[in-house]
Amino acid sequence: MPPNPTGPTNSQLRMLARFLRKAARANSASIWRVVAEFVEKPRRQRVIVNVGKLNRVAKEGDVVVVPGKLLAGGQLNKKIIVAAVKISPKAARKVIEAGGEVLTIPELVRKYPRGSGVRIVI
């Protein structure tokens, strides 16, 4: 291992990135490759999104992937499907209370293998 690793040393994140790259190749869906690139970033550059931002950028019924952590800041009043690397319990509760659905990223890839209609929020 190099003296200063610049990617994830977390084995689960590395496996997730590998899974996303394989899904991108198998399904000819470049969205999963882009998500893998975000997942592989160093810790200081990882994505953190609040629920309030989802409320601003997503439309009713959207499918959204957050290639990082989803936190509970703000309000959500739209029914959306959200997948993220990590989701705080309060954020998950807010999404579910708004009528949405919370998935893991692998579940989202299996549900939408081509990535059609999936939006990346960073």
From Swiss-Prot:
One of its GO terms (molecular function) is structural constituent of ribosome. The keyword Secreted does not apply. Disulfide bonds: none annotated. One of its GO terms (cellular component) is cytosolic large ribosomal subunit. Keywords: Ribonucleoprotein, Ribosomal protein. GO terms for biological process: translation. Pfam families: Ribosomal_L18. Signal peptide: none annotated. PANTHER family: 60S RIBOSOMAL PROTEIN L18, LARGE RIBOSOMAL SUBUNIT PROTEIN EL18. Belongs to the eukaryotic ribosomal protein eL18 family. This is Large ribosomal subunit protein eL18. The gene is rpl18e.
